[in-house]
């Protein structure tokens, strides 16, 4: 019976296994050859392939079509990984599987970077392959052994008879799947990863890296949660009276592009940001854990005070599992001091599961796109100026409780290569003409000027209130502009931040202090005396 099962299946199984390694040659960065990988990584690859082959066999009972189906799925992941690496300098990782459903819900945020024609071709090609496989390859039948008889040929009275000849087929297929699963699990326990996506992919290969990352994500995070900085933080014995309002602007794709392109962009596009820096409590370049996207990495690092090194697998999407179980953050800490904690993001509240996650992180309220139905847009998203006006109204209408508002802007999200650029935009942001391949930079700089206008508006209105307040502005990551970077060079990847207070403005300006986004929250709170100093911070704002 075993021979009858394996003889017709062994050729497609082995052909598919070899091709599954061959497809990885298309990856960027390219993994090392299979014979140079750790034995455990090879075991995971063979185990996953065996499991997938068995499942396809059980589903379609067409071995060659099953092989083609698995390889097509693998090829799709390879293409997505390469598109991601091209735009974000990072290959596909296990938490990214969630983005397949997000791409259906929010196609504008994803499909432009994969390519609309590529997506249509992939869908159409898979549909054609599905039809061809089902139409051209016969189902495994009694010719390979009476126990392989198909359902279509089985008499109706034996359809649910455990002694019917089809039962051994599924029993053997299940045994094959189980052997693949056991091999993958056993080898996976010996597969070590460093959580540097490119390095792990090159060293282990695609299947082994994805399996290892998935296994790590399923491990308990209780110890990580207990070690969270805000789980053990202590408030100062004496707090400012009154407590200052705290405004944090997490600005989409914000960085001082003049630093990267000093001779190309007009210096006045960030005039208000320069003014804030000249009066700042602290300012400088900000090291963030994202390039071009993945806002929640920077967002969670600020809220939690935890960098990627501490988060392990959760650094890639902390809202996917870790934050969904609750986590002490700056919001929960400020809430314990009596603050009303609010997050404002003019986009769909369910994106990144923020509607479920943010309350668990200590926010009293999360305000999404529903509050901005009539707001002015710049491009497809709510404009930064309209968002700034909303924040000012919140400050003006707040109750006796001090307010902590964390604002996540959306205007400069992109895709920039889909935006229209007119001659007025060129004159507003450029010192000299740019090559046609750099039109994305013009669109980006236009939104950068709008963000700067919002900052100037906030500064003016906050000063008019004559109430203590502290403003923190930082960029979540640099923008996605691959054609610009290829033509005139790419930035380093750091963004910028500024901390500005109403009570202590330094007319002469202070020297820049570069820091990481995980450290920024400590700097921010320490300057207000709301937190016992963590490390050395040379400046403090006295609101008394």
Regions found by a protein language model. Give the residues of each.
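Transmembrane and membrane-interface helices of multi-pass
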Residues: 1-202
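Helix-boundary/low-complexity linker signature
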Residues: 14, 43, 243, 255-259, ...
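Short, glycine/acidic-enriched capping/hinge loops at junctions between secondary-structure elements
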Residues: 29-33, 258-262, 418, 484-485
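Short hydrophobic "helix-edge" motifs at membrane interfaces and signal-peptide entry regions
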Residues: 51, 241-243, 465-467
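Short alpha-helical segments and helix-capping/turn motifs at coil-helix boundaries
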Residues: 53-54, 230-235, 326-329, 390-391
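Residue-level preference for non-acidic, small/hydrophobic
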Residues: 103, 246-252, 407
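Membrane-interface segments at or immediately adjacent to transmembrane helices
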Residues: 180-250, 259-262, 266
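Solvent-exposed soluble domains appended to multi-pass membrane proteins
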Residues: 251, 267-544
